[in-house]
Amino acid sequence: MKIAIDAMGGDHAPKAVVLGAMKAIKEYSDLHITLVGKEEEIRQYLTSEERITILHTDEKIESTDEPVRAVRRKKQASMVLAAQQVKDGVADACISAGSTGALMAAGLFVVGRMEGIERPALSPTMPTVDGEGFVMLDVGANVDAKPIHLYQYAVMGSVYAEKVRGIKNPRVGLLNVGTEDGKGNELSKQVFTMLKDAPINFVGNVESRDLLQGVADVVVCDGFTGNVALKSLEGTALALFSMLKEQLMSSFTSKLAAAVLKPKLMVLKDKMDYSEYGGAALFGLKAPVIKAHGSSNDQSIFSAIRQTREMVAKEVIPTISSVMEKEPLQ
């Protein structure tokens, strides 16, 4: 199995990418990795070249670049070359912690869209209080959506949750303003009706306040709603941890309490740590394309590689394609 990685994408590249790649190579004997980027910088952190190849390029896509224009003009950028490796059949999948918009453009224009899928979806795995997490899609690939798009998101998310996350008969929920049937705008109502007849375990409408409780294994929404929900959850979690830290450090007594509670607090922190959940998959493309978090450390990169390997090994893309062929809904 071969995975191409944009070694120059992310806040801590290439160090985090190289260290994460070496960790993955040690863990998985069937894995070969191509690191795409500036060879001189990559070699500063590469202590073992076992099953690791470097594809040198001086060009990269910056966070300030306009995504589509950058992908079309910077043909030798590390992200574009990683995607090209997939298109050419040299790699089975690609990963980048660089610009989300640019990676979506590279996925569409270079890797290509899966036949029958109208719009790709960006899908991270979000944490829950029980540590199991849930898949949410779309969180920003498309801010506007039609009912058919959300129907396809539900099917793709269900296949992923079962194949990669090992959840038998995953629960699929539609993010809405209430749990009752008939709630929401016209889009939500149409999608609800369609999902009731879909080849998935549809559990109905779910509310954002229940997401972290694990009310569903897959949560479906349009990209605008998903992005707002995602950032609200992230912001709330950061604010709560900040307030908790402030209170625990406010007096000598509370500091003693903090020392006693530290092991439990670390468990809680680990449950909410994005670095353990891998990256956000771009569903609807011809091959796995994974967007790692922009601030990924080496553990985050390793988790994204593990996730990508599972997608390839469990044949997620062919399975989605097969299911969609059996359920042509236009």
From Swiss-Prot:
Pathway: Lipid metabolism; phospholipid metabolism. One of its GO terms (molecular function) is phosphate:acyl-[acyl carrier protein] acyltransferase activity. Keywords: Cytoplasm, Lipid biosynthesis, Lipid metabolism, Phospholipid biosynthesis, Phospholipid metabolism, Transferase. Its main location: cytoplasm. One of its GO terms (biological process) is phospholipid biosynthetic process. GO terms for cellular component: cytoplasm. It catalyses: a fatty acyl-[ACP] + phosphate = an acyl phosphate + holo-[ACP]. Pfam families: FA_synthesis (PF02504). InterPro entries: FA_synthesis, Phospholipid_synth_PlsX-like. Gene3D superfamilies: Isopropylmalate Dehydrogenase. It is found in: Cytoplasm. Its EC number is 2.3.1.274. Belongs to the PlsX family. Homodimer. Probably interacts with PlsY. Catalyzes the reversible formation of acyl-phosphate (acyl-PO(4)) from acyl-[acyl-carrier-protein] (acyl-ACP). This enzyme utilizes acyl-ACP as fatty acyl donor, but not acyl-CoA. This is Phosphate acyltransferase. It comes from Bacillus cereus (strain AH820). The gene is plsX.
